[in-house]
């Protein structure tokens, strides 16, 4: 079994300091949280950025400030900007961090109803366009899937040459409007991807650590962080993203699965630094 890649989604676009006062907004806070996760064992930093007041932004300039500062604090980390941004952003806004030529970026592979009137729109043409710019800028996509139909979309587009292979998937589980976070559903998703593909599991809230354990024992990789869950255990806010990563490292040790370094993660993901 491959070594375990741990991704830290350190702030997201929706979670706020009201949910957990340690959620980072400023560049300094974002770097602090990235370093806490990196030092704990995360090799990938999944990155959203905020204005100082917490407003989500896809500003290329703001991303550059954060990326440069994270690289200085965590020189070997794989920084993976989000192209999901926040609900309601334009395609042009969402694409901005791709033009910084990061090693990886997220590629959302379908539309999802997030609840109420919130629709996270990702049409087929949008996915093709985003992937085109990733290929042009040498960016490895992480195919974000919220249900099985999005895997089918990614496979279909890959067969047409729109998405490079082998693909790496992120199974986003337990989101309103998406697939549930259960062992049965994870096994179903794993059986739906091409055999040469790799996958990470991102489960929301209380599901984060049970599904992390499932990912570890099924040969997948794990994402944790404030974007997906702000608690270290029931009713106890996490002190940092690093604390969440440390818990995954302990789980991996119990199951006898070594944690990948950033250089080992690059080899697994097929990324050339």
Swiss-Prot record:
Annotated binding of (5S)-5-amino-3-oxohexanoate, by residue: 14, 82, 85, 106
Domain of life from the UniProt record: Bacteria
One MF annotation (Gene Ontology) recorded for this entry: 3-keto-5-aminohexanoate cleavage activity
Binding of Zn(2+), residues: 46, 48, 227
GO biological process: L-lysine catabolic process to acetate
UniProt pathway annotation: Amino-acid degradation; L-lysine degradation via acetate pathway
Function per UniProt: Involved in the anaerobic fermentation of lysine. Catalyzes the reversible reaction between 3-keto-5-aminohexanoate (KAH) and acetyl-CoA to form 3-aminobutyryl-CoA and acetoacetate. The reaction involves the deprotonation of KAH, the nucleophilic addition onto acetyl-CoA and the intramolecular transfer of the CoA moiety.
Subunit record text: Homotetramer.
Protein name: 3-keto-5-aminohexanoate cleavage enzyme
Organism: Acetoanaerobium sticklandii (strain ATCC 12662 / DSM 519 / JCM 1433 / CCUG 9281 / NCIMB 10654 / HF) (Clostridium sticklandii)
Species classification: Bacteria, Bacillati, Bacillota, Clostridia, Peptostreptococcales
Gene label: kce
